[in-house]
From Swiss-Prot:
Inactive GDP-bound Rho GTPases reside in the cytosol, are found in a complex with Rho GDP-dissociation inhibitors (Rho GDIs), and are released from the GDI protein in order to translocate to membranes upon activation. The modification Cysteine methyl ester is found at C193. A motif (Effector region) lies at residues 35-43. SUPFAM superfamilies: P-loop containing nucleoside triphosphate hydrolases. Keywords: Cytoplasm, GTP-binding, Lipoprotein, Membrane, Methylation, Nucleotide-binding, Prenylation. Residues 194-196 form a propeptide. This is Rac-like GTP-binding protein RAC9. One of its GO terms (cellular component) is plasma membrane. A lipid is attached at C193 (S-geranylgeranyl cysteine). InterPro entries: P-loop_NTPase (IPR027417), Small_GTP-bd (IPR005225), Small_GTPase (IPR001806), Small_GTPase_Rho (IPR003578). GO terms for molecular function: GTP binding; GTPase activity; protein kinase binding.
Length: 196
């Protein structure tokens, strides 16, 4: 009997960056058109990666401040985090290191992080950018820079609407959870003892 390993994957990030859309796009190959703020939700699916079947538990969390005390309850037992920001929102990009990294490092310090830039289809959409003058595009190099700054394992950009790279986000997360990176060891300080 082949027992599949359970992997808990938790999505975090500001409200309205597309976390729920990314999960729905991945699990049902559809794109929801109505925005409904998430309080908490989860999905489960059996997935085959590199010939191994895993039971992937997807935990969707609310990014709104109203849920700051409730959200960390979903972090317990996480194998990997998908930390999402919108590629058309400078505020969500900045909150990755201002809000989300401190929260994740406090509640789940050793869990690997996949940094995800969402809404890739809108980054170069001239009509959208014209209609939304407050939208500021985040470049791939800025995402890579942020990945290094926060110590994420990898960075990937996706579009839930077009499904570009959505499967890749979850494939990478599963592979990281199955073979998490070894934590960097702090150098051991040698203490010496001197007798006088």
């Amino acid at each position: 009997m082949n027992t599949s390993r359970f992997i808990k994957c938790v999505t975090v990030g500001d409200g309205a960056v597309g976390k729920t859309c990314m999960l729905i796009s991945y699990t049902s190959n559809t794109f929801p058109t109505d925005y409904v703020p998430t309080v908490f939700d989860n999905f489960s699916a059996n997935v085959v990666v590199d010939g191994s079947t895993v039971n992937l538990g997807l935990w969707d969390t609310a990014g709104q401040e109203d849920y700051n005390r409730l959200r960390p309850l979903s972090y317990r037992g996480a194998d990997v985090f998908l930390l999402a920001f919108s590629l058309i929102s400078r505020a969500s990009y900045e909150n990755v290191h201002k809000k989300w990294i401190p929260e994740l490092r406090h509640y789940a310090p050793n869990v690997p992080i996949v940094l995800v830039g969402t809404k890739l289809d809108l980054r170069d959409d001239k009509q959208f950018l014209s209609d939304n003058p407050g939208a500021i595009s985040i470049t791939t190099s800025q995402g890579e820079e942020l990945k290094k700054m926060i110590g994420a394992v990898t960075y990937i950009e996706c579009s839930s609407k077009t499904q570009q790279n959505v499967k890749a986000v979850f494939d990478v997360a599963i592979k990281i959870a199955l073979r998490p990176p070894k934590p960097k060891r702090k150098p051991i300080k040698r203490r010496s003892c001197a007798f006088l």
